[in-house]
């Protein structure tokens, strides 16, 4: 199962709706023994965009780590402004079973950035 974080919702109800969708998809994937990959927006994960986007990205990363702790194969990819290698890493994380609970950051957006 591959879940792509959408653009930041307009309100908290939108955040709740996205998280509920991610929960249901992840629950089914976990029950079926399918690997889970969340594709996150790097700027949101770093808190460099909207508050609601940051809440959403952080909650999804927490879900990945919880799923992994519960013995599921679950990982995340944080995609920056250039998604050039995203599909490659998504496929790697989805098609393997040795790595779980990890976050792969793509692009240099997180290096040397001060939170603003």
Question: Model regions: which residues?
Answer:
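Rossmann-like short-chain dehydrogenase/reductase
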Residues: 1-84, 88-96
């Amino acid at each position: 199962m591959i879940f792509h974080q959408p653009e930041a919702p307009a309100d908290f109800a939108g955040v709740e709706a996205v998280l509920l969708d991610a929960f249901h998809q992840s629950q089914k994937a976990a029950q079926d023994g399918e690997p889970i990959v969340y594709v996150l927006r790097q700027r949101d994960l770093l808190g460099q965009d909207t508050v609601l986007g940051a809440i959403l990205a952080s909650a999804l990363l927490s879900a990945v780590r919880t799923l992994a702790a519960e013995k599921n194969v679950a990982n995340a990819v944080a995609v920056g402004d250039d998604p050039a290698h995203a599909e490659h890493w998504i496929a790697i994380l989805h098609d393997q079973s040795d790595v779980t609970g990890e976050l792969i950051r793509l692009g240099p957006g997180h290096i040397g950035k001060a939170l603003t």
